[in-house]
């Protein structure tokens, strides 16, 4: 998708960005077959430590921040430090971020404007949390995600892991 964007090839950009988003959905589906890869389990455990709704919400917020922005509200310095491959987190957080990023790039393609991250401020080898207008808006969304209690829950497990893995293997083996 990045190469297609640089070449201003809208058709290839759509193909590759959609393929990547589909892959994230498929990874989330595969992880949903195993209880140990579940974001809801993490949040449920965090909420269990609270004695009242206020404490439960705070523990959920802290547990969410730990695996997303890794820090307090504002300007975390090492966001994504604790990335987890968990169902619910991929579909509910990482996929949505990528959708926003690709939509922003698509807007630039449609408008015929350039976009480059070459000179953006860096923190630990990646774009800073609020490196430009897009990342600032994305940062607001990320902090809102962290602060929202009772996030959409995913079933602890869903689907057969062997069937799902076999189907996805066949799907992606043909792309190699």
Feature map (PLM): residue ranges:
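Catalytic domains of carbohydrate-active enzymes that cleave complex glycans
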Residues: 1-176
